[in-house]
Each structure stands twice: as C-alpha cells, then as structure tokens.
Amino acid sequence: MPVQFSRHALEKIRRRNVKTADVYATLKFPDEVYEDVEHGTLVAVKKVNAKSIILAYKMEAGVVKVITLYYTTKLDRLLKAKTVRGAWKRVK
C-alpha cells in the first residue's frame, strides 16, 4: 500500500532522527493500534529497542497518510492517560 507523509511528519522524522525502517515496520507490523476519537485518526504503536514509536495516520482511498510520529520511553503512562479519558480506543 502506498504511503504519503505530511510535511509535519517529514519534519519530525528529520528532527527526531526517526529511522524510516521503524516507520514502515510500525505501519506493517504494529504491536497495538488505537483509534484517536478526538482527531479521527489511527495510532500505531510499536516497541523498538528501549523506546516505542507512536505513529498517527489516516487511510484515504487506499493510501496511508502519516500525520505525525514520535518516539517515547513512557509508553505505559501515555496509553493509560489516553485510554482512561477516552481519547484513544484500542482496535488491535
């Protein structure tokens, strides 16, 4: 499936030294997927070494549109905060 990156996502990749391989691995083989009900996007999560990558994207006409992404070392804390307040709902 084709993948497009927003300017914002490309800037985050460059500034945060996110590896392209990590991005594609997260899209193809996520550990978890959440629906961000506040923004109408999907959020893929994948552990990569000691960090986790969080990737927000939309599916439009068969194209994956990556909106933003970042690494975190505090995944459990983030997921708890987002799911408890109902911002994210687990779909996978």
Locate each region found by the language model.
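Ribonuclease/tRNase effector modules and their secretory precursors
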Residues: 1-92
